[in-house]
Amino acid sequence: MATPHHSRRGSMAYYPRVRAKSIEPRIRSWPEISGPVKVQGFAGFKVGMTHVEMVDYRKTSVTAGQPIFVPVTVIEVPPLDVIGIRLYDEDEEGNMVVVYEKWTQNLDKELFKKITTFKEVKEKPVPETYADVRLIVATRNKDVPGIPSKKPEIFELRIGGGNSVKERFEYATAHLGKTIRFEDFSKPGKFVDVLSVTKGKGFTGHVQRFGVKLLPRKNRKHRRMIGTLGPWHPDWVRNTVPQAGQMGYQQRTISNVRVLKYSKGEDADTINVRGGFLHYGLVKNDYVLLFGSVPGPAKRLIKMRDPARQKVPDIDNVKLDYISLESKQGD
């Protein structure tokens, strides 16, 4: 008879399991894309979840072409203000260094709560010789009633596409001091990667954190803990041993999330549920519906980028027959 065996409980894919350095997710890599020049990312605030009825567009599904109910996440995506441009180049060691930086002259006073000095790199830009072009954008927290903090978040978005870095630089220059919308980044039917910091659970035990098996009923003193810290040798506790500690409040990336709908702020009433969304309120700006769930609680900043490993082709249109606006308060 074969020896019974199961895989280890708890993934080793995400280590160390510590709190994120910032509540704002960080995009560490950008995929290369083809086609016209465009911005490769966007950001919004998580509102909550509801469900929609739609025609199943998945050709290999058993319900292909039939109406189905699916859960969706509502993300409020007000326009982003383009407040600066950065050009990057590689040094001898392959590190990306800033070689050109320019800020708009029309800076909102709210930005000085985040950055006290705006230093420009005065080197004359020669885009053809550089490696990357980024937009420096700021969120409009003051236009979102559901967000308690009115201090804007400032971050970079890569510009991709086109035939040369010069085209991307011209695109960035044309948008400096203006705003960009979600439609400049993506549209319904396309995939995006979603980055967010998950809900924080605090200090939790072995069972909740790793899903290890409960010890027998007659075990001495404890049941909700591990049976051993490891072998005698090596004579230290290895990091593969499941132990109690921080759970949640960690950055995660969800790949290939389908955009089901995008709508302008004038049509916000088409998504506001009865009584408002829990812990958020009402949507007042542009919003987008994403298939399924995304990490993080309501009000958290959510970043999106072009998919890095897309496996399924985009579709031209998603047909939504019904959006549930029933109260989420349990009545």
Swiss-Prot record:
This is Large ribosomal subunit protein uL3. Part of the 50S ribosomal subunit. Forms a cluster with proteins L14 and L24e. Gene3D superfamilies: 3.30.1430.10, Ribosomal protein L3, domain 3, Translation factors. It comes from the Archaea. It comes from Thermoplasma volcanium (strain ATCC 51530 / DSM 4299 / JCM 9571 / NBRC 15438 / GSS1). GO terms for cellular component: cytosolic large ribosomal subunit. Keywords: Ribonucleoprotein, Ribosomal protein, RNA-binding, rRNA-binding. GO terms for molecular function: rRNA binding; structural constituent of ribosome.
